[in-house]
Amino acid sequence: MIIFPAIDIIDGKPVRLFKGDFATAEQVADDVLETANGFVQAGAEWVHMVDLDGSLKKERVNSQTFVDVAAQTPLKVEIGGGIRTMADIDFYANNGISRVILGSVALKNPALVEQAVKEFGELIAVGIDAKNGFVATEGWTEGSDTHYIDLAKQMEAMGVKT
């Protein structure tokens, strides 16, 4: 089994949210790289990282932090949050990131997901957040009328594997 320890980031610091609620953000460590190295020492091969600032601002905010973890640890890094364009995906693909997770854009711009899968293959994953069975977007701040299973089936039909 592959365990994916996670580091969510707000203002460059590792945090945890309770049920995706930004009002519950609690800093859990002083340094992202130190946290990642702790996961290495515990035997992790992957780390799941989320740019929570990016998810709210709808753009890459903490991207250099992700790149630093990929460059300075042996971890495979999968990232999500604030990824809205092919240029964002290309940036990560060319800077050592092992997997790019598309979230809100999967619902709001499925054509971009389809293009990304064609260009980058299994580097692309789709993360679907759901509240009460329906897709939630923009860092859990917006709801939708789309059932999460329907979106998952649509993504699978486009060639998304993860």
Regions found by a protein language model. Give the residues of each.
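Short, acidic/polar
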Residues: V28-V40, R84-F91, G143-Q154
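Extreme N-terminal starter segment of soluble prokaryotic enzymes
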Residues: M1-I3
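Glycine-rich, proline-tolerant flexible connector loops at the mouths of alpha/beta enzymes
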Residues: W46-Q64, S104
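Catalytic domains of carbohydrate-active enzymes, especially glycoside hydrolases
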Residues: G38-V50, N95, A157-G159
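Catalytic cores of alpha/beta
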Residues: Q72-T73, V77-R99, L112
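Conserved anion-binding
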Residues: P14-V15, K19-A23, I97-T162
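Conserved beta-strand positions in the central sheet of alpha/beta enzyme cores
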Residues: H48-D51, E78, I101-L102, A125
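Alpha-helix-loop-beta-strand connector modules within alpha/beta enzyme cores
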Residues: P5, K57-G80, L112-D129
